[in-house]
Amino acid sequence: MFAKLENKFNVVDKFNILGTIGLIFALLGIVSVILLPFNVNFFNFDIDFLGGTTMTYDMHTELDKAELDNIAKLVEDASGVAPSSVQKSEGTQVVIKTTTLDTEKRDAVFSALKEAYNLNDGTAKDADGNIIPTDMLSVDNVDPVMGADLRNAAIVSAFLAILCMLIYIAIRFDWRSGLAAIAALAHDVFVVMGAYVVFRIPVNMTFIAVVLTILGYSINATIIIFDRIRENRKVLKKTSFGEIVNKSIWQTATRSLNTTITTLLAVGLIAILGVSSIQNFVIPLIVGIIAGLYSSMFISGPIWAKLIKNSK
């Protein structure tokens, strides 16, 4: 399918352009991370990382986007704090997450929702004199210290995953291929971070699941190409390494593209049919899968070729 492109479009020779394109897409994520130590935050950090209050209510009404937006406005008006997320849960239940609210503000939120949606507060009785259960299902606070612990654990997990991948690739191929793969993985992670900023997706423990999933998906796509490069090196001994890399990329392009399309079809259906909490996982996953396809084809191999060339 892509055999004709092998001679018409040399990926290694075009790396300056392809690498710049990748850098542009990753730039928002890179800048957002760099600015964090300077108290400039573009991310929508959830209470999992910062601490805060989680409130769950049964609204007894269908919760579409308009209703969720209305609930978010009611919460902000009542508490003076914009919620970090308002998500539909089971049935007609809604989960609201904010920065830490004291008892007075939590009561104000419930009063506002009670008035707007005729919620039960646990004092009303039915026709038989039985108390009707309250529609305030739960209120939980996450301590900021616990949030910091979760954040640190997440960073360590991602770092260890990348380190293990680097060691594995360096052993299986060579250390330069390991560096090339890490550069591609970094590209994917920063692109995903940019998606979190653009779509204002809450950054919580789901973020770690997304990142680790993308790392695994991307490294698998990269290893497929690296395997083909290694096999071609055994056969094409008189061919330059750059040409071998280019040939190997286009030889595996059909497989890479088909795998990505198949995965996107499945994940896309989940994004369309799933509730908002699932969509917050799936949307950055879709972005990461596409970024992984790009980096495995147009970043990792060319960087490996450049490192080989510069080491001679």
Question: What function would you assign to each model-found segment?
Answer:
Residues 1-312:
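A structural signal for conserved, well-ordered secondary-structure elements
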